[in-house]
From Swiss-Prot:
InterPro entries: GCS_T, GCS_T_bac, GCST_C, GCV_T_N, GcvT/YgfZ/DmdA, GcvT/YgfZ_C, TrmE/GcvT_dom1. Transmembrane segments: none annotated. One of its GO terms (biological process) is glycine decarboxylation via glycine cleavage system. The glycine cleavage system is composed of four proteins: P, T, L and H. Gene3D superfamilies: Aminomethyltransferase beta-barrel domains (3.30.70.1400), Aminomethyltransferase fragment (4.10.1250.10), Probable tRNA modification gtpase trme, domain 1 (3.30.1360.120). It catalyses: N(6)-[(R)-S(8)-aminomethyldihydrolipoyl]-L-lysyl-[protein] + (6S)-5,6,7,8-tetrahydrofolate = N(6)-[(R)-dihydrolipoyl]-L-lysyl-[protein] + (6R)-5,10-methylene-5,6,7,8-tetrahydrofolate + NH4(+). GO terms for molecular function: aminomethyltransferase activity; transaminase activity. This is Aminomethyltransferase. Keywords: Aminotransferase, Transferase. The glycine cleavage system catalyzes the degradation of glycine. The keyword Transferase applies. It holds the Pfam family GCV_T_C. It comes from the Bacteria.
Length: 360
């Protein structure tokens, strides 16, 4: 298993470690529910150093990223970021990503999913339009600082005034001599940021954040709570809501597809999927009867027709009830529509509901 720069730190602090996509990662510290609720009320730290970082530089950097991604990279100015997609040549998705503009037209950092890092790098290299593309994943650790008190903690630790940064921006600086990039992005629905730090400085930064945030209730958060937090927001996770066959419009990601820009990989087929009409939608749902939804469970109409599949499901710590995300036939996708969920041969009632499940 691969280890992040924080692996030894997690062990010393008593985290329960597991294999996650080939990485030795903390699934929880004191318990999923407590960690989840702490991020919703105080502040939590996430080790996201397993995520991949791909640098795209040079005179052809913008042209390359415009071709590789569905969103319009040309709109980004220095210090701005955007959520985007890497479309494949079959009408599905290689990955969902965040593009950070470090220097307009010529220097970008692309953050990719841990499980897709090698695949993404190979894809980007194969379809390069002449940029200098390098895998910088081993150079960086990454810590997400999330929660209502996250910005207060950041302002205590960093010279950069994070509380004054706009959402989806990035600034470069240093921490105890180590290069850092602070990005006001996240995966929880809370205020906060994600800090790229030179690998050698990651453990020191983690311990400093814990110490400086003690009175704010700061604690380490495992992958278990990271997943329940993102599920409550109906944020997509690759391998669940999206994969290499997903129609991005059906997944609710049409807002990051820009047909007006000159061209991108497989543009005609991707945009054509919307014009052809959608057959299913990605929706949130709640249970009306006892049961926890899990990925792969089938959805049925009341006349016993299979109408969809669960992509993610959990017991929501914030709402204290089971919630799920599913692809469902468009005829059943309207809020308030009831259906049956097959839980190991037992069919129980559920209802399509408004998302995100948790709002501030």
């Amino acid at each position: 298993m691969k280890k992040t720069p924080l692996a030894d730190t997690h062990e010393k602090l008593g985290a329960r470690m597991v294999d996650f996509a080939g990485w030795y990662m903390p699934v929880q510290y004191i318990g999923l529910r407590e960690e989840h609720n702490n991020v919703r009320t105080n502040v939590g730290l996430f080790d996201v150093s397993h995520m991949g970082e791909v640098r795209v530089k040079g005179p052809k950097a913008l042209e390359t990223l415009e071709w590789l991604t569905t969103n319009d990279v040309s709109k980004l100015n220095d210090g701005e970021a955007q959520y985007s997609l890497l479309p494949n040549d079959q009408g599905g998705l290689v990955d969902d990503i965040i593009v950070y503009c470090l220097s307009k037209d010529s220097d970008y950092l692309v953050c990719v999913n841990a499980s897709n890092k090698d695949k993404d790098f190979a894809w980007m290299t194969k379809h390069n339009k002449g940029a200098d593309i390098t895998d910088e994943s081993d150079l960086w650790g990454q810590i997400a600082i999330q929660g209502p008190k996250a910005l207060e903690l950041c302002d205590r630790v960093f010279d950069i005034k994070v509380s004054e940064m706009k959402s989806f921006t990035v600034k470069s600086g240093t921490f105890k001599g180590h290069k850092i990039m602070i990005a006001t992005t996240g995966y929880t629905g809370e205020k906060g940021c994600e800090v790229f730090v030179e690998a050698a400085g990651t453990a020191d930064l983690w311990m400093t954040l814990l110490e400086k945030g003690k009175d704010l209730g700061c604690m380490g958060i495992g992958l278990g709570a990271r997943d329940t937090l993102r599920t409550e927001m109906k944020y997509s996770l690759y391998g669940h809501e999206i994969d290499d066959t997903t129609n991005p419009y059906e997944a609710g990601l049409g807002w990051v597809i820009k047909p007006a820009k000159k061209d991108f990989m497989n543009k005609a087929q991707i945009v054509g999927k919307k014009e052809a009409g959608l057959t299913r939608n990605l929706v949130g749902f709640k249970m009306l009867e006892k049961g926890i939804p899990r990925q792969g469970y089938s959805l049925f109409s009341f006349d016993n027709k299979e109408i969809g599949k669960v992509t993610s499901g959990t017991h929501s710590p914030t709402l204290d009830e089971p919630i799920g995300i599913a692809f469902i036939d468009v005829a059943y996708a309207k809020e308030g529509t009831e259906f049956l969920l097959d839980i190991r041969g037992r069919k129980v009632k559920a209802v399509v509901c408004k998302t995100p499940f948790v709002t501030k």
